[in-house]
Design a protein with these regions (language model features):
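Active-site and donor-binding regions of nucleotide-sugar-utilizing enzymes
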Residues: 1-130
Length: 130
């Protein structure tokens, strides 16, 4: 996680009583936490070195409605889509807010015949909490 104000963000988390520690993606501790966490939730992609262990549960929520060009439809898309596709394929669950988003992501990242996890049709956490 690239933190703009890590001290301020950590102070806020501590002030509301959450037992959460922010770890910068550039810190070696991030690698350890990523490798040893039981639950992984991401709305983007983990670094290219990430491989989910069998005992980990990975929920991929992506980060928006795909109204722009993605994956193989991008210029140089086939060459540049590796890490995103890699992350989707390691997820146990991929959450989509609607059928349009599911269709675009599954097609643009060539997941239709490759993805063996569970597709969850549900609102996004940041929107559906309200």
């Amino acid at each position: 996680m690239n933190l703009t104000h890590p001290c301020r963000d950590q102070k806020f988390i501590d002030s509301i009583g959450l037992k959460v520690e922010l770890v910068d993606i550039a810190d070696f501790k991030y690698v350890k936490v990523l490798a040893t966490s039981k639950y992984l939730i991401n709305n983007s992609s983990f670094p290219a070195y990430f491989i989910r262990r069998d005992e980990q549960v990975y929920l991929q929520t992506w980060h928006g409605t795909p109204l722009k060009t993605l994956g193989k439809r991008m210029r140089f898309g086939i060459e540049s889509m590796y890490n995103v596709q890699h992350n989707f394929l390691h997820a146990n669950y991929i959450m989509f807010p609607n059928e349009f988003t599911r269709k675009v992501i599954m097609e643009d990242y060539n997941l239709e015949a490759l993805y063996t996890g569970t597709v969850v049709m549900n609102g996004y956490p940041r929107n559906s909490i309200f």
